Amino acid sequence: MLVVVAYDVNTETKEGRKRLRHVAKFCTNVGIRLQNSVFECHVDAAECKVLKHRLEQAIDTERDSLRFYYLGNRYQSKVEHIG
């Protein structure tokens, strides 16, 4: 399935910058970077659960945010790429 992950990590503190590096590195290992904080991840259901869990553990929910867009297995008709 295709899952698009977008994140915003507060980097005002040293801990925030460390969280950002951790989230970015994990996403880079799992998916393809589309923008600085947006990744396209082709995963199965089990990998998706691990992805979500690991990212939830990495952020500070009071300062940071995550978004998961679940496009499923038939995502080709839902995604248009120009340029």
Predicted regions: what they are:
Residues 35-65, 70-78:
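Short, intrinsically disordered low-complexity segments
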Residues 80-83:
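Short, low-order "capping/linker" segments at domain edges
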